[in-house]
């Protein structure tokens, strides 16, 4: 991908784990939350990781590529350990890959707290807006307070 396509600097992070098919990259290891980043949300996932760490909650951050079939076993193992999953997906499609991960995690770890952050839909039908906004304070509060058992869409 050309730098001109992205207004952000590219992150150069050390890897903790790479899936055999290069579908999943893990950048951090933690026991308090699992963060799965789809599309171009790895920088936001790392920022959320840092904000959680400031509140005493460590997290595992994964970047997920769109590879079929999906092997998210390392993410599901992390959720089984942490009990919390945050999916960040800034894709413009209405068929977000993040929803498929939420479904698999719900089956594998039904007691886990599951939150997905997507683009805001300002219109009933059509193309999603270019903005992707995360209310980090509200998200961190949700994660460090008593976990909800119901999936949440933000």
Can you annotate each of these PLM segments?
Residues 2-154:
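Thiamine diphosphate
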């Amino acid at each position: 991908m050309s730098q001109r396509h992205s207004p952000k600097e590219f992150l150069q992070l050390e890897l903790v784990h790479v899936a055999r098919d290069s579908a999943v990259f893990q950048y951090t290891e933690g026991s308090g939350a699992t963060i799965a980043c789809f599309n171009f949300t790895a920088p936001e996932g790392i920022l959320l990781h840092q904000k959680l760490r400031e509140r005493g909650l460590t997290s595992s951050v994964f970047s997920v590529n769109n590879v079929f079939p999906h092997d998210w076993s390392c993410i599901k193992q992390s959720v089984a350990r942490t009990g919390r999953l945050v999916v960040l997906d800034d894709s413009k499609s209405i068929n977000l890959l993040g929803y498929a991960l939420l479904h698999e995690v719900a089956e594998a770890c039904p007691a886990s707290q599951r939150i997905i952050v997507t683009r805001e839909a300002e219109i009933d039908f059509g193309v999603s807006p270019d903005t992707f906004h995360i209310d980090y304070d509200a998200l961190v509060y949700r994660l460090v307070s008593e976990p909800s058992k119901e999936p949440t869409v933000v």
